[in-house]
């Protein structure tokens, strides 16, 4: 939990796109774990984005009979606006746990990759030409067509669920990695990402379907 709360300085991107799950892992020691009161933490400097993400995820948990609260209603502004010491983080974790929270779900950006795609006529990729002349003849149009190269970003985002009552190396219940491609609009991205998280948790039987 110390590590989790200390990543509050990392930017959490919620802004539209295509959301794809990349990987997921569930702690085999928590196969029957069912969260009852969840603190939802969206790591971002953008307060609007944070509120939208946490509120949307809270609504999804509530619809499944799980008590959930947004971190902006729990954390003091001084906690998220400044870097915390380990002692201060421990105190906040204890305060949250003492208030009845048994779980925390936190999401943060782990990295960003810039990609390049070429837009133009389609070329055969399933055949190898054995003569240079034939190869060059067929592909020389790349010099003359109106295709272009376009850059876009892929954001690698991680969501993790922790058991606050453990508060040790075994407290991680579930973690999943997602890729969000070239986000544009905040509302659509948040909806897509939250839905992806919920589907993952349902698949692992951590939460029930509606």
Sequence positions of predicted segments:
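Positively charged n-region of N-terminal signal peptides that target proteins for export
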Residues: 1-5
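Residues that line or immediately flank small-molecule/substrate-binding pockets and catalytic motifs
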Residues: 8, 108-111, 180
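C-terminal motif of bacterial Sec signal peptides marking the signal peptidase cleavage site
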Residues: 12-15
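C-terminal/domain-edge helix-coil "capping" segments
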Residues: 17-36, 138-210
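A general structural motif
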Residues: 35-37, 101-102
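N-terminal segment of the mature soluble domain
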Residues: 45-114
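Surface-exposed short loop/turn segments
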Residues: 87-160
């Amino acid at each position: 939990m110390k590590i989790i709360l200390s990543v509050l300085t990392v930017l959490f991107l919620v802004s539209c796109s295509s959301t794809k799950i990349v990987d997921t892992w569930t702690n085999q020691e928590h196969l029957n774990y069912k969260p009852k009161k969840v603190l939802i933490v969206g790591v971002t400097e953008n307060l609007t984005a944070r509120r939208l993400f946490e509120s949307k995820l809270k609504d999804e948990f509530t619809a499944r009979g799980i008590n959930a609260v947004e971190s902006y209603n729990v954390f003091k502004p001084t906690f998220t606006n400044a870097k915390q010491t380990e002692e201060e983080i421990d105190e906040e974790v204890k305060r949250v746990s003492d208030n009845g929270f048994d779980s925390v779900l936190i999401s943060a950006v782990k990295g960003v990759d810039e990609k390049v795609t070429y837009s133009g006529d389609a070329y055969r990729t399933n055949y190898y030409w054995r003569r240079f002349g034939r190869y060059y003849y067929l592909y020389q149009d790349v010099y003359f067509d109106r295709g272009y190269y376009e850059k876009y970003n892929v954001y690698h985002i991680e969501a993790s669920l922790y058991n606050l009552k453990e508060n040790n190396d075994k407290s991680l219940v579930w973690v999943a990695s997602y890729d969000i491609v070239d986000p544009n609009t905040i509302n659509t991205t948040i909806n897509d990402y939250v839905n992806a998280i919920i589907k993952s948790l349902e698949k692992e039987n951590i939460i029930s379907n509606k």
